Amino acid sequence: MLTVAGIRYRNIMASQGGPIARVDTAECQVFGRRMFQANVRLNAAVQEPRQRFVIFGNVDGTGTHPVPTVARHMAISEAIERWAFRSVSKSVDRVLYGFDTDRSSSGMAAYPGLFDYQCRQRAYLEAIERYSLIAWWEGQARGRVRDTEWPGVSALEIETPFRQGRAVVVYKRCEPGFFAYGHAAAGSFHSACEKAIVELARNEYVLRRFWLAGGVQERPVDLFERRCLFFSTAEGHELFRERVAQAVTAPAGRPPVVFDGEIPGPWTTYAQVWRVVLQPVTDAFLTNTERYFFW
């Protein structure tokens, strides 16, 4: 897909008046494939106060790709999305962009492209992923387990009412005895798995360090991190398996679109930010419980 990131991100660093304070890039392995991971921090003027205890790190954007420049551009785009979310989700304009319906960042994307559809397509797939995950967990979408080409990794393919998106959850038992997951949506089953595998690999790396260190008594501040930790345990994975085995008698139909449009702001200088909000089957995914498979 056509991108002009090299042009739009040329003055992105704080030293040039931009919103990005720091970009770090390192080589990594994703199931034996050489890739690069970039982590980005926003500058102090546009970031929230850092949380006191986190296990996934206090970065604002992450990107993983075989090409280091692309990984950096992906991480910058994610940080810009985060900037827009933090600025708008609690503002007086929040209702205009569907944050009264879904106060999470679901259905958001940032992309330094030339045309609206480039960013919208990413936001739409993000919305499909999150909607499908919630509907499946609530017993309103069927799922079937499929093998994958990655050793030890299974995939749950979630049936969706959308023509343009396939949603999956990939999962794996990891040493020394925890479970890691990744979920994504894309145009095909294989493409969705490829995206989700990167998320699984990141989670596996962080969770292995956490559990090999013996865990900690202090609870993470972030609800989604607490959920990720819970479902990495044997108890959490058993709850996940119970949901995989549940019968679905009345699948949810195609949901109403609450919002589908651009979120303008100072970030538009660098990238377009788009959001698609699909009416979720419930708002229970935002309740303060660790026993909900959504993060």
Regions found by a protein language model. Give the residues of each.
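Helix-coil modules at protein/domain termini and other flexible surface or pore-lining loops
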Residues: 1-295
